[in-house]
């Protein structure tokens, strides 16, 4: 067994001895808990909640130790008082007498002499002279030589077998007479997707660039910098290179990363088996980069400040592989290439343009010729008896048996796509043999979140024998949940603007949380400008990520309105693929995804019995309001329910000495989201925000009746009742104990539907 892997240790019994007492026949009541094994040291997937609970436990141990050291009976006394000296002398008298002469001298001293002893005593100690020893000469001295015998049975070379060849008796007197050169070749065992373990003989220990910033990965600038660094390490010339995932190839991916859990973000109320949540033809591994070689146990571990990566392995069929390699346009008809194009589009059009940080970045993709991964066997092990008896599986079984009986010498070639047929059909629709695994795997390397939303909000425990030690409470206050909801809806609004629809999105499959490194309650804030209106969103250390898990979907409806090639896709988009869809139908389906995620039914007893913590009641009421709202424009939904993130000076009076002198008359048209001044009396002005300018000349503004409450009001006013503020002066927001709302946000994201 590999020493680098976690070994499952059976729990110990509470009773010892040869005859343990008999247990009661009544079965105990066991509450379901989410139990996980101990995390390996150096992993980048330790959550903020786990760190918080660990620090609390350490503080409890320190406080308990300090209470034991203090005496609960005697009051604290000064060490210079007579009582303290007497008690100290009494304690010292109980100690064993090391030197009777020193003790006698101390007894002869009077109390006055003891009181006036010098505080510093100077002594001169002569250094001990060490005589040089004469080196012993062995009976025979031989020249060093390189052994030519290779290690036998993959064991280490033993230089002791070549010692004392000329004078064997010298071994009894002088030990080794020749310093033998050590030439050990270590084979590092790494867990891999090919089954068993992978023997590696080369490990690259890289170092992440830049300084150890306080808020790592909190901005897209830091994430794009990491993207460039990883690509320079892994990619030689361009994407689509060949790379191996075992020791058979020259360039192995496992020389740079360490594979960890399989399908780590899988959540189900029925089973904890990660294979159940994998779609056919996909393996998802959690990994870390960079890695370090651990010489004590001959294994590979994550570096101290490593980052998390997702390694996605897609099984390419013959039709999928050859359609891409031959640069045929039909390759966009296959879901695997549509997902790759989706990641590329998100990286170039959303991430790099800084529209939203709530999507994972695709670092690189490779091809891996490898037939050792048995995707078919993985699918068979996950099917239920009902699925095994279905017609779909019977047909799938016939195809697999047909290719197995053809022999290894038969070469399957792609058929011609000349378009001469009356009905458009893809290669795997004409010949089912083209649906079989081609022996080539597509590898996508993306950013990795820590958990999905349900795992983030769940109580988790770490097993240590019979002890279940909590690692995450799963409880978060109203402010953090409000922040999470804003990020989810803003990301869905970006998908609505770009016309990106992922079929049947759910919380467990598509909403993930990445923990950020922060110090204190908050680490600055992000600034979203959505349709011209600025939102100041605090960074509480949690970043939402909307991702695709390539799950198998079955639907009777079709978005593709064509007479041929009636295929159901997992991702639809107007600006990514060659097909064009009805924008209204896409927006309608994106809104259905929003209604499926923002729903009170997402936190029913089905999930709470699985240790999922419900959001606070105020958040549940907000979710209910949003789910019942018929508004389909998600930008309007954000503007309606997240006004707490607007400038907190809205509805407050202008400061007489510093702000009123900067008030100006209206000389131009107001912009959406611009701070304006409302005249409420003689030399009395109140801050407001312009929402939009109406066609009749009135202006829609956002204000508050009470500056201490969140009762935001939208009303139409005449432009004569408004003033403009000097554009050369800053508007200082009110102080917040948790967030410093200055003029330096972490990053600014701009989302516009125009």
UniProtKB/Swiss-Prot annotation:
It is found in: Virion. Residues 26-35 have a biased composition (Low complexity). Disulfide bonds: none annotated. Residues 49-60, 76-93 have a biased composition (Basic and acidic residues). Coiled coil: none annotated. Its main location: virion. Residues 15-25, 36-46 have a biased composition (Polar residues). Keywords: Virion. Residues 62-72 have a biased composition (Acidic residues). The keyword Cell membrane does not apply. Residues 1-110 are annotated as: Disordered. The keyword ATP-binding does not apply. One of its GO terms (cellular component) is virion component. This is Uncharacterized protein R403. It comes from Acanthamoeba polyphaga mimivirus. The lineage of its organism: Viruses, Varidnaviria, Bamfordvirae, Nucleocytoviricota, Megaviricetes.
């Amino acid at each position: 067994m590999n020493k680098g892997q976690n070994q499952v240790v059976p729990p110990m019994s509470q009773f010892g001895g040869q005859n343990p007492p008999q247990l009661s026949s009544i079965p105990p009541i066991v509450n379901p808990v989410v139990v996980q094994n101990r995390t390996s040291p150096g992993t980048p997937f330790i959550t903020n909640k786990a760190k918080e609970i660990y620090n609390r436990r350490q503080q409890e141990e320190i406080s308990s130790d300090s209470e034991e050291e203090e005496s609960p009976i005697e009051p604290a006394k000064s060490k210079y008082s007579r009582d303290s000296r007497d008690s100290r002398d009494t304690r010292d008298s109980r100690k064993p007498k090391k030197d009777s002469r020193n003790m006698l001298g101390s007894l002869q001293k009077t109390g006055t002499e003891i009181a006036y002893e010098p505080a510093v005593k100077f002594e001169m100690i002569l250094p001990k002279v060490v005589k040089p020893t004469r080196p012993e000469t062995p009976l025979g001295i031989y020249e060093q030589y390189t052994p030519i015998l290779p290690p036998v049975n993959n064991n280490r070379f033993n230089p002791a077998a070549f010692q004392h060849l000329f004078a064997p008796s010298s071994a009894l007197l002088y030990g080794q007479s020749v310093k033998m050169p050590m030439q050990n070749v270590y084979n590092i065992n790494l867990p891999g997707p090919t089954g068993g373990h992978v023997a590696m003989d080369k490990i690259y220990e890289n170092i992440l660039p830049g300084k150890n910033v306080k808020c790592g990965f909190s901005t897209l600038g830091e994430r794009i910098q990491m993207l460039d660094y990883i690509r320079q390490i892994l990619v030689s010339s361009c994407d689509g290179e060949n790379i191996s995932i075992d020791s058979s190839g020259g360039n192995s991916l496992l020389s740079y990363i360490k594979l960890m859990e399989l399908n780590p973000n899988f959540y189900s109320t029925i089973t904890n088996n990660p294979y159940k949540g994998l779609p056919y033809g996909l393996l998802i591994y959690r990994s870390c980069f960079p890695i370090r070689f651990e010489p004590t146990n001959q294994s590979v571990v994550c570096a101290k400040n490593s980052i998390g990566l997702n390694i996605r392995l897609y099984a390419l069929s013959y039709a999928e592989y050859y359609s891409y390699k031959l640069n045929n346009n039909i390759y966009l008809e296959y879901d695997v290439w549509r997902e790759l194009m989706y990641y590329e589009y998100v990286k170039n059009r959303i991430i790099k343009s800084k529209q939203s940080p709530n999507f994972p970045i695709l670092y690189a993709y490779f091809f891996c010729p490898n037939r050792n991964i048995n995707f078919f066997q993985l699918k068979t092990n996950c099917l239920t008896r009902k699925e095994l008896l279905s017609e779909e599986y019977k047909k799938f079984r016939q195809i697999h048996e047909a290719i197995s009986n053809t022999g290894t010498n038969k070469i399957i070639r792609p058929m011609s796509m000349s378009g001469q047929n009356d009905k458009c059909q893809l290669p795997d629709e004409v010949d089912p043999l083209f649906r079989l695994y081609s022996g080539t795997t597509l590898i996508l390397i993306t950013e990795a979140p820590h958990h999905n939303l349900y795992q983030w909000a769940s109580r988790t425990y770490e097993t240590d024998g019979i002890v279940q030690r909590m690692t995450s409470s799963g409880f978060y206050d109203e402010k953090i949940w409000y922040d999470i909801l804003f990020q989810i809806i803003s990301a869905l609004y970006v998908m609505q603007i770009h016309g990106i629809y992922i079929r049947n999105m759910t919380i467990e499959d598509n909403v993930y949380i990445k923990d950020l490194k922060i110090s204190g309650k908050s680490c600055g804030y992000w600034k979203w400008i959505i349709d011209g209106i600025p939102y100041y969103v605090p960074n509480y250390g949690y970043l939402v990520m909307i991702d695709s898990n390539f799950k198998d979907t079955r639907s009777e409806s079709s978005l593709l309105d064509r007479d041929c090639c009636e295929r159901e896709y997992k991702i639809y988009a107007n600006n990514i693929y060659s097909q064009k869809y009805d924008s209204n139908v896409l927006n309608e389906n994106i809104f259905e995804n929003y209604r499926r995620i923002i729903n009170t039914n997402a936190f029913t007893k089905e999930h709470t019995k699985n240790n999922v913590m419900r959001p606070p009641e105020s958040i549940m009421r907000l979710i209910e309001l949003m789910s019942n709202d018929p508004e389909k424009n998600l930008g309007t939904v954000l503007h309606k329910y997240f006004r707490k993130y607007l400038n907190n000076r809205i509805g407050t009076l202008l400061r007489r000495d510093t702000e009123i002198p900067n008030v100006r008359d209206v000389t131009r048209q107001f912009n959406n989201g611009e701070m304006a001044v409302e005249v409420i009396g003689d030399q009395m002005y109140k801050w407001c925000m312009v929402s939009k300018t109406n066609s009749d000349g009135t202006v829609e503004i956002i204000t508050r009746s009470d500056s201490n409450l969140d009762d935001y009001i939208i009303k139409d006013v005449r432009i004569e009742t408004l003033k403009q503020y000097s554009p050369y002066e800053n508007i200082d927001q009110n102080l917040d104990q948790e967030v410093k709302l200055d003029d330096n946000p972490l990053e600014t994201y701009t989302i516009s539907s125009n």
